[in-house]
Amino acid sequence: MMYSLVALGFVLIFKASGVFNFAQGVFALFAALTLVGYQTGQVPFAHLINELFGTNYHHWYASMPNFLAIILTMITMIALAWIIERLVLKHLVNQDPIILFMATIGLAFVLEGIGDLMWGSDVKVLDVGIPSGGSEWLEQATIGLASEGSDYYGMYIDVLNVWATVIAVILVISLAIFSQYTKTGRALRAVADDHQAALSVGISLRSIWVLVWGISGFIAMVAGIMWGTESGVQFSLSLIALKALPVLILGGFTSIPGAIIGGSVSYTHLTLPTIYSV
């Protein structure tokens, strides 16, 4: 279900602008790097500053509470969305989708480079208190399903994936309610249907894009937390965008609930051969 979290960000931006945001995976990486940086008190651009000025500063403080670090990371991702709109998107309104797609490819490389300069390229451990590992009670409960003398030792499901499923469902329900029952949500749907018609009735395209990219940045942060908790925060994390492509193909590029369905099918396909521990 962690693939669904990445796919949600793709769907939101594609619905609002018709653009496949190639940088969504890098968003998740950047959010995870920033969160670890806040948690550990790391000085941004420490390596660059120390090289230029001959200093040896690496940390502002010893640690930061997880809740505060997550809040600051969320603010950072929303600010990043605003900067992207101001510097990139506002100059590309009404351009061909291929131009916008190429812009997101360039954006991915730029963000990846900035993340490297800010926080370094070493693998980092991310821990926000989310439990992980196999569910022992499920294994014990399913041992009895096998016949006596068999080599079946119970069903294995990672607790982290259970948490990811719950969070993804909550996000989908929240986004569905937001888009259906709020004025801003209806404006977002209008922009998704027809940019020119939305502009003609006074809807600010730039405001909607900032909102969508901000929400997408928040979702990327959630995905980055989940993936970083599972496999560590490393630059290969940006490749999860490619792993989310089957989810988008199965669920649809404009369907928010489809991201959950596609993620469920993809996760089942990937884990079914190893779901039983023997």
Where are these regions (language model features)?
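Alpha-helical transmembrane segments within multi-pass membrane transporters and channels
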Residues: 46-107, 114, 261-266
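Transmembrane helix-bundle core of multi-pass membrane transporters
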Residues: 52, 56-57, 91-92, 100-181, ...
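Membrane-interfacial amphipathic/re-entrant helices at transmembrane-helix boundaries
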Residues: 1-6, 20, 34, 43-69, ...
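Conserved small/polar residues in nucleotide/adenosyl-binding loops
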Residues: 268-274
